[in-house]
Amino acid sequence: DVCDSLVDGRCIHNGCFCERDAPNGNCCDTDGCTARWWCPGTKWD
């Protein structure tokens, strides 16, 4: 499947990867991070 982004060489499939202290600074989702896109929903290869 298609990767939205890579972090540490791993694939992010949910479109967004965020840190609590930078919720919009390192997000792959074009709409910016929202609660529903927070890290616990991230799926790794």
Swiss-Prot record:
Q: Does the keyword Magnesium apply?
A: no
| Tissue-wise expression | Expressed by the venom duct.
GO CC, alphabetical: extracellular region
Keyword Transferase in record:
no
Instruction: Please list the residues that carry the modification 6'-bromotryptophan.
Output: W37, W38, W44
Disulphide-bridged cysteine pairs: C3-C16, C11-C28, C18-C33, C27-C39
The UniProt keyword set, sorted, is:
Bromination, Disulfide bond, Hydroxylation, Ion channel impairing toxin, Neurotoxin, Secreted, Toxin
Domain of life, per UniProt, equals: Eukaryota
What's the domain remark here? The cysteine framework is XII (C-C-C-C-CC-C-C).
* Function per UniProt: Mu-conotoxins block voltage-gated sodium channels. This toxin reversibly blocks voltage-gated sodium channel in cephalopods, with no alteration in the voltage dependence of sodium conductance or on the kinetics of inactivation.
The protein depicted here goes by the name: Mu-conotoxin-like Cal 12.1.2a
Source species of the chain: Californiconus californicus (California cone)
Top-level taxonomy:
Eukaryota, Metazoa, Spiralia, Lophotrochozoa, Mollusca
